[in-house]
């Protein structure tokens, strides 16, 4: 089987799903990880398999649980007998002011955003070394300039940025490790939805004066995995220039 294989966490919807589609279009086979969005994950898998048979599979796992992380890595590496890329996209995001944050908040946010990427990569190391593969970590522009009332989230993403650079040094020359930091691409949903006034305030500080598209992120990930063999240890901000005004 000559098609490269990518494991994408949190790939049932939003940026993860767009990344799976983009890599698939470029000839990759994809392992679609999901936690609770089984219907969306299976719909995506079936759509990709219709365009290219046996090229996508979905796997469930709670990335805050160590056993699930180990199982997901094993399944991803064994399904096609190889693994060429790990995309750490899954993330937990919600406010937790310091005076109100609980140990459960710490476990959930740090577990999903920092601990899981570390140990998932650890389990995938043999396969990635064999394939001379790549790792992409989805970070955030708030890893450098924190968002108010989100100390745990910002700390987790700052930690992931540090891991990105550390791994790039430690795992070279066998494995390249880079990061992508999205700006205003898709507004948060549900309880974390951003009101229109706040959206406009963010866009007013964005030189491109608009939101980005999910394909902007997926394209950046594809570039770093497919077209940048001499790039490692870099974190690419895809934010319309927003980080210039933070």
Model-derived features: positions:
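Conserved glycine-rich Rossmann-like NAD(P)H-binding loop of the short-chain dehydrogenase/reductase
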Residues: 26-43
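Catalytic Tyr-X3-Lys loop
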Residues: 92, 99-118, 136, 153, ...
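Substrate-binding pocket helix/loop in short-chain dehydrogenase/reductase
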Residues: 97-98, 102-107, 191, 198-202
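Active-site helix of classical SDR
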Residues: 121, 156, 164
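Short C-terminal tail/terminal secondary-structure segment
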Residues: 145, 222, 226, 232-246
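Alpha-helical segment proximal to the catalytic Tyr-Lys
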Residues: 126, 168-173
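Conserved glycine-rich cofactor-binding loop
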Residues: 12-14
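Short, small/polar-rich loop/turn modules that mediate ligand/substrate recognition or access, typified
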Residues: 172-176, 232-233
């Amino acid at each position: 089987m000559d098609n490269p294989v990518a494991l994408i966490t949190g790939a049932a919807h939003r940026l993860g799903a767009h990344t799976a589609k983009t890599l698939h279009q470029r000839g990759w086979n994809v392992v679609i990880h999901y936690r609770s969005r089984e219907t969306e994950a299976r719909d995506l898998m079936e759509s990709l398999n219709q365009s290219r048979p046996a090229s996508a599979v979905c796997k469930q796992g709670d990335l805050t649980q160590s056993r699930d992380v180990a199982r997901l890595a094993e399944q991803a590496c064994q399904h096609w007998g190889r693994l060429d890329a790990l995309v750490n996209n899954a993330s937990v995001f919600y406010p937790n002011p310091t005076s109100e944050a609980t140990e459960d908040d710490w476990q959930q946010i740090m577990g999903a955003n920092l601990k899981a990427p570390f140990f998932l990569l650890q389990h995938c190391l043999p396969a990635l070394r064999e394939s001379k593969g790549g790792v992409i970590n989805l970070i955030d522009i708030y890893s450098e300039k924190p968002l108010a009332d989100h100390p745990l989230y910002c700390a987790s993403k700052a930690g992931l940025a540090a891991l990105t650079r550390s791994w790039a040094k430690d795992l070279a020359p066998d494995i390249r490790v880079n990061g992508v930091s999205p700006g205003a691409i898709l507004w948060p949903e549900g309880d974390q939805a951003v009101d229109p006034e706040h959206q406009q305030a963010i866009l007013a500080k964005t030189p491109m004066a608009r939101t980005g598209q999910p394909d902007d992120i997926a394209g950046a990930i594809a570039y770093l995995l497919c077209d940048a063999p001499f790039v490692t240890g870099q974190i690419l901000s895809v934010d319309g220039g927003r980080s210039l005004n933070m």
